[in-house]
Design a protein with these regions (language model features):
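Signature of multi-pass transmembrane helix bundles
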Residues: 1-47, 156-286, 305-306, 378-403
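Short glycine/serine/threonine-biased micro-segments
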Residues: 5, 52, 61, 101, ...
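Membrane-embedded alpha-helical segments and adjacent helix-loop junctions characteristic
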Residues: 22-121, 250-339
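Generic signal for short, ordered secondary-structure residues
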Residues: 94, 98, 133, 224-227, ...
Length: 403
C-alpha cells in the first residue's frame, strides 16, 4: 500500500507542479504491463521449478540433502536455533548459497524455494515469517556474487577496453552487502556471533573466498570469461549427474521420485502467481510515477550543497531501480554506458552496483509468496539495509579504484 501512496503523491506533484498530464496514463500502462510481465516470469519459473524440484526430490530420497544437513548442523543450530538438528533445510540452504555465488540462477531459485518450504514446515505462525526464514531471505537477497559474468558481457558488448576491470570492485562491494545483511539480521535476532563454532566457520569461509578471489584476479579477461562459463555449466550439469548417480546407487526409484518432485513445482508455481503480480504491479506504479527521479534530484542537490563530486549521481538510476526490477536496472546500466561511455566513472559505478545488489522486492515476492507469508517483520528493512551498504560500498570502492 505504501508504494501506491508514494506513487500517488509523486504523480500529483508531476501533474500540478510540472504540468505533466501523461503521468496517470503512464502509471496505468505500467500497471497492466507489469501484470503481463508477472505471468511471463511465472511461465519461465514454472518450467525451471518443475525441472529442479524433480531432481531435488531424487537427492532427498537418496539421503544427500540429509547428509549435507548433518555436516552443517553445528553451525545452523547457532544461526537458526528453531531448525532441528540434521533438518534437510540446512542442506538446501547451503546448496542455494553455492548456486547463487556461482551465478547459477536457474538452479538457485528452485533450490531456494524448496528450502523456504522446508523452513515453513517448522514455522508455528504460517502467515508470519520466522527468524530462520528472515535470515535465509536476507542472505539470499544480498547473496555473494563470485562470478558476475553478465556484467562482463554487457561491458564487452559496449566496447570496454577490459570488460573484467570491475571484477574486484564488484567482489568487494558484494562482500560488504552480504556482511551487512548477515550482521543486521544477527542484531535484530540477537544471534551470538562470538560462539567458537560460528567464528570457525566464518574464518574458513573467508579463507576459501580469499583463495578463490586471488586465483580469479590473476586471470585475463578472456580466460576469466571462459573459466566462468566452464565452471557454471560444469557445476550445473554436475549437480544433475550427481543426483542421478546417488539415486541409482541408493536404489531410489529415480523416475517416480522425479515426477513426485515435479508435481511439487506445479503447486509452488500456482501459489506464487498472486503474490508476484501484487509486488511487480506495485513496483511498476512506483517507477512510472517519477518518484525515483525526485529522489535523484534531491541527492544531486545535497551533493552540490556540500561541494561533493557529483559523478556518482549519474550511476544512481541503476542503484535505485535494482531492488525493484532486474531488467530495469540492466536497462539503466546500458543507458549509462551509452550516455557516458563504457569506461567512464559513472559506468564503472553502475556496473559495480549492478553486480553487488539484488532485486530485493522480487526475491521477497517469490520466496515469501511461495509459502504464503504475509508479514515479513524485519526482513524488508534488513534486505534494504544490505542493498544500501552495497551501493555505498560500490561508490567508495569505485572512487578508490577509478578516482
Amino acid at each position: 500500500m505504501s508504494f501506491f501512496f508514494v506513487a500517488l503523491l509523486s504523480a500529483v506533484w508531476r501533474w500540478v507542479g510540472k504540468g505533466d498530464t501523461e503521468v496517470f496514463a503512464s502509471m496505468v500502462d505500467s500497471l497492466f504491463s507489469m501484470a503481463k510481465l508477472s505471468v511471463e516470469v511465472m511461465i519461465l519459473l514454472f518450467g525451471t521449478l518443475t525441472l529442479w524440484l524433480g531432481f531435488l526430490k531424487i537427492a532427498e530420497h537418496a539421503g544427500l540433502v540429509e547428509k549435507i544437513a548433518s555436516w552443517l548442523s553445528p553451525l545452523f543450530r547457532r544461526l537458526m536455533p528453531e531448525v532441528p538438528k540434521n533438518h534437510p533445510a540446512a542442506g538446501l540452504i547451503t546448496m542455494n548459497f553455492i548456486a547463487n555465488g556461482l551465478g547459477l540462477d536457474n538452479a538457485a531459485t528452485p533450490i531456494g524455494l524448496k528450502a523456504m518450504r522446508s523452513l515453513q514446515s517448522l514455522n508455528p505462525t504460517p502467515k508470519i515469517a520466522s527468524n530462520a526464514q528472515i535470515l535465509f531471505l536476507v542472505m539470499n537477497a544480498s547473496s555473494l556474487t563470485l562470478l558476475p559474468v553478465s556484467i562482463f558481457m554487457y561491458r564487452a558488448q559496449q566496447g570496454a577496453l577490459d570488460p573484467t576491470l570491475v571484477f574486484l570492485p564488484i567482489l568487494l562491494a558484494t562482500s560488504a552487502s552480504t556482511l551487512a545483511g548477515f550482521f543486521s539480521v544477527a542484531f535484530m535476532q540477537r544471534i551470538k556471533l562470538n560462539d567458537p563454532v560460528v567464528i570457525t566457520w566464518m574464518l574458513a569461509i573467508a579463507s576459501l573466498l580469499s583463495v578463490f578471489i586471488l586465483f580469479l584476479s590473476h586471470l585475463s579477461a578472456s580466460a576469466l570469461g571462459a573459466f566462468s562459463s566452464l565452471l557454471g555449466n560444469a557445476v550445473l550439469f554436475g549437480l544433475i549427474v550427481t543426483f542421478l548417480l546417488i539415486g541409482i546407487l541408493k536404489r531410489v526409484p529415480v523416475y517416480e521420485s522425479f515426477i513426485e518432485g515435479a508435481k511439487e513445482g506445479f503447486d509452488v508455481s500456482k501459489n506464487l502467481l498472486p503474490y508476484l503480480i501484487a509486488m511487480l504491479c506495485a513496483v511498476g506504479i512506483l517507477r512510472a510515477s517519477g518518484a525515483l527521479d525526485v529522489v535523484l534530484d534531491m541527492i544531486r542537490y545535497l551533493a552540490d550543497s556540500f561541494h561533493w563530486d557529483t559523478r556518482f549521481v549519474d550511476a544512481l538510476p541503476t542503484a535505485l531501480v535494482k531492488p525493484f526490477s532486474g531488467s530495469a536496472a540492466r536497462a539503466m546500466l546500458i543507458d549509462t554506458m551509452t550516455t557516458h561511455g563504457v569506461d567512464s566513472f559513472p559506468s564503472f559505478l553502475a556496473a559495480t552496483v549492478q553486480g553487488s545488489t539484488e532485486t530485493t522486492f522480487y526475491v521477497l515476492a517469490v520466496y515469501f509468496g511461495a509459502v504464503g507469508i504475509q508479514r515479513a517483520r524485519h526482513a524488508v528493512a534488513c534486505a534494504l539495509f544490505a542493498d544500501l551498504v552495497g551501493v555505498l560500498a560500490s561508490i567508495g570502492v569505485c572512487y578508490w579504484f577509478f578516482g
